[in-house]
Structure formats: C-alpha cells, structure tokens
Amino acid sequence: QILTGLFLAMHYTSDTMTAFSSVTHICRDVNYGWLIRYLHANGASMFFICLFLHVGRGLYYGSYMYLETWNIGVLLLFAVMATAFMGYVLPWGQMSFWGATVITNLLSAIPYIGSDLVEWIWGGFSVDKATLTRFFAFHFILPFIIAALAGVHLLFLHETGSNNPSGLSSDADKIPFHPYYTIKDILGVLLLILVLTSLVLFSPDLLGDPDNYTPANPLNTPPHIKPEWYFLFAYAILRSIPNKLGGVLALVLSILILAVVPFLHTSKQRSMMFRPFSQCLFWILVADLLTLTWIGGQPVEHPFIIIGQLASILYFLLILVIMPITSLFENNLLKW
C-alpha cells in the first residue's frame, strides 16, 4: 500500500481544480498508472478483509487477553480507518466530496465545541481546497505511523508469545520461524495476491462507487451517500439512531467496544474452541455484522430502517450481555 501510494503521489495533485484530472491522468497516461491506482484502491479492501479476519480470530480464540497487544490493535484499527477515509476523499469525485462532508459534519454533534471543531478541520466554511490539501498530507503521514504502531504491536506480542487455538501455553511446542512458518505463510500470501490481482485485473470497480467517476460538485448531492463497503456496518449503526449525537456515539462505540471485550471475559477457558454455545453466538455476531454491512448500503426506507435498528441492538447486546452470560453458563455446564 505504501509503495503504490508513493508512486500515485508522484503524479497526484492535491488541488480541487486538478485532483480529479490528475487521477484520470494517472489512469490514462502514466505507464501502468491504472494498475498502480487499482492495486492501491483494491489493496485497501484486501487490507480491511485481513483486519476483520484478524480481529475475528482474536475474539474467537481469546487473544484479547494480551491487553497491551489488543489495545494497540484497537488503536491501529482506528488509524487505518481514518487513513482509508481520507484516502477516499483524494480523487475528489462526488462520493469523495459528499463522504467528506457527511463524516466531518458528525463532529458538529460534539456539544459546545462541535461547530468550531468542524470548521477548524475543514479550514473554512465547507469542504474545500484546504480540506483536500490537509487530507492528502494526513493520508501520506498516517501509514508510517501505522507501520510504527504495528512494530509496537509485535513488540508487545513478543513479550508473551502468540496465542493458539486451544488457548493453552504453546511453550513446549515452539519451532523455528524459518523454514516452518515462512513456508506456511507463503500459502496465505499467494491466496491474498490471487484475490487482489483477480479484483484489479477483472473487475477493478466492483467495490467502488460509480458516483466517484463524476467530479465533485458542491451544488449537486448524490441520491445515496454511502462509504466504501468496509465502513458500511458502522454507517448502518450510525444511521439506526435518529439522533445526531447518539448516532455518533454509537458509531465510535461500535469499534471502541473491542477495548471492553477483555473485561467481559467470564469463561474459565480462554479460547472458544471447546465452547459450542459461545461459538454459536460468535457466528451470530458475524452474521449480524454482515447484515449491518448490507443495510449500510441500502436507502433509508421501510424494511431497512427496522432491520438496521434490530441488527444494531443485537450487535451491542451480544457483546455486552449475551456472550458473557453464556460463558458463565458454560462454566456451570462443566461443573466449574
């Protein structure tokens, strides 16, 4: 991502007048510019698929018991989401502009300082030149901060060693990283590259929004403003609350709730490997998140509103109430 981003930055201009044209120029005139652009855009999607799988794996096997590692991971998730959001603004298409307008506007829900804060971030009274320029600057710097944080993430992981599916100590079974893990990892890397190249070379716009091929126009709002697919679940939670501040809080908490998970671990076992009821609830949570992702991309109309609200309630209920109680129930089943 950093490499493709670097090559894109060589040809991109962060001015409202030329940003859209510069992206078009990259795709049409720069040698393999189209490839670099689509690798970067779809690489972000693959990045998020990996992150979601990584977080899901951590939840399933109780890896969140490594508190420092887990909390830095949550911080990393926020940083990557911020980076992806700002990157989406850079091509300066309709969805770029209106996405930036809608999401930055959410900060105005903060009491007292809200409206001042929004204008400070915009660098004016609307999303404009100043906003685009600073978003480009931040989008360039953040990945390096993320890379550094990922180093710290690993540093703390190495204090304890990694977890395994059984949730038991694996000290007795440790083997050299090379050649064993290096060979094993090649499979995953090849699979990742296969999916990414298939996306980029066969349907590069599959995950994008056609509205972003229309240059940004402050006078014309697109009929359906929605973020990239990897934000849709959070967007659905935001929209399911008919109050601005409430929605913003729910949006932030939908991710921040991950930091609370270690303190809600009531089971006497670490992993879900031998806990069928918790497993069942975990997959219900996954299905719920997929439902939210689907709802986030739908218009705000009758079946979708209520489905989104129910899915949002279920999301918080599962994590905060149902799963901890089920863990206690499983403890009793084993006469512990």
Swiss-Prot record:
Gene3D superfamilies according to UniProt: Cytochrome Bc1 Complex, Chain C (1.20.810.10)
Entries under Pfam families matching the protein: Cytochrom_B_C, Cytochrome_B
Location of the protein in the cell: Mitochondrion inner membrane
Note describing how the cofactor binds: Binds 2 heme b groups non-covalently.
Record carries keyword Mitochondrion: yes
Superkingdom in the source lineage: Eukaryota
Membrane topology classification: Multi-pass membrane protein
Membrane-spanning ranges: 1-10, 34-55, 70-90, 135-155, 183-203, 245-265, 277-297, 304-324
InterPro entries (UniProt xref): Cyt_b/b6_C (IPR005798), Cyt_b/b6_C_sf (IPR036150), Cyt_b/b6_N (IPR005797), Cytb/b6-like_sf (IPR027387), Cytochrome_b (IPR030689), Cytochrome_b_C_euk/bac (IPR048260), Cytochrome_b_N_euk/bac (IPR048259), Di-haem_cyt_TM (IPR016174)
Positions annotated to bind heme b b562: 40, 139
Residues annotated to bind a ubiquinone: 158
Family note: Belongs to the cytochrome b family.
Quaternary structure (record): The cytochrome bc1 complex contains 11 subunits: 3 respiratory subunits (MT-CYB, CYC1 and UQCRFS1), 2 core proteins (UQCRC1 and UQCRC2) and 6 low-molecular weight proteins (UQCRH/QCR6, UQCRB/QCR7, UQCRQ/QCR8, UQCR10/QCR9, UQCR11/QCR10 and a cleavage product of UQCRFS1). This cytochrome bc1 complex then forms a dimer.
Note: Heme 1 (or BL or b562) is low-potential and absorbs at about 562 nm, and heme 2 (or BH or b566) is high-potential and absorbs at about 566 nm.
Function recorded in the entry: Component of the ubiquinol-cytochrome c reductase complex (complex III or cytochrome b-c1 complex) that is part of the mitochondrial respiratory chain. The b-c1 complex mediates electron transfer from ubiquinol to cytochrome c. Contributes to the generation of a proton gradient across the mitochondrial membrane that is then used for ATP synthesis.
The protein's name in its UniProt record: Cytochrome b
Gene that produces this protein: MT-CYB
